[in-house]
Amino acid sequence: MVTAASAGATWFDIPEILAASGKNASLNKYGGFPIGIQSYSLRGFGVDGAIEQTHKLGLYFIEFFSGHFPITKDKIKVDEMTKKLDKRDMTISAHGVNGFGADHDKNELVFQFAKMAGIKNISANPAPNSFDSLDKLVAKYDIRISIHNHGPGALYDKIEDGLKAVKGHDKRIGFCADLGHYIRSNEDPVEVIHKLGDRLYGIHLKDFSEQKKRTHGVILGKGHLDVPGVFKALRKIKFPADGALSLEYEETPNDHPKLLADIGKCLAIAADGALKAKQG
């Protein structure tokens, strides 16, 4: 069977997916985009609390960080997580950010975990000496590596740093563009999306007040993020149906009422931007 994902389709190209899926209302709200959350945003909650809050926010896609879902060989633990998510019709869109080095066996443990958990995208910070290993692993498991930029001073600070790193490697080694960190690196997030193109498998929707290393996070669109422009660019490059499109809001993790209110504001702005992009 050829799935929407394997055919390179996008949610907004395939109305039958929307009609058949329990995620219909959420997908329609966000213009057909599979918007979810990076669970690091909810690190002030335990894993069960993070899942519950994600559900209450009306989101069906979650990108876990290891603090909520540690990498494990234990199938029982993975199955327990799967059951929790299945009850809410939720999907793990990605896991990370995970480090990779030259140790192939250690790298493979992450892929084995991802395969067990049904995770298609691994957000990653791979060392330069990891790429030969990763070429073999993405081919063996058919799971993507999405290189995450961490802002000024990091390995993949600028757009060109990432593009140079993946040159000549398996196309399943691509990118998770943290748009907030690109703002800190004085890069234009919309240009980032266009340049990374069909190797873009993940997005961290994030905004910062200033284009410099030390700054603070703000509600989407209140800093330097052109929210409608981001979604127009994602439509242009045909962001994949099984990619990870995650809101990441890092402020006030332990002030739960403020955190959830701010996340709600970000999601409302994202929905508005996504619908504007859909309308052209």
Predicted regions and their residues:
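Histidine-acidic metal/acid-base catalytic patches
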Residues: 1-34, 43-57, 162, 166-177, ...
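Active-site acidic/histidine proton-transfer and metal-coordination neighborhood
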Residues: 4-12, 27, 48-51, 68, ...
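Short active-site-proximal "capping" loops at secondary-structure junctions
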Residues: 42, 66-72, 100, 252
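A conditional alpha-helix N-cap/helix-loop micro-motif detector
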Residues: 43, 74, 103-104, 127, ...
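Glycine-rich, proline-tolerant flexible connector loops at the mouths of alpha/beta enzymes
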Residues: 63-86
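Conserved residues at the C-terminal ends of beta-strands
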Residues: 65, 98, 125, 206, ...
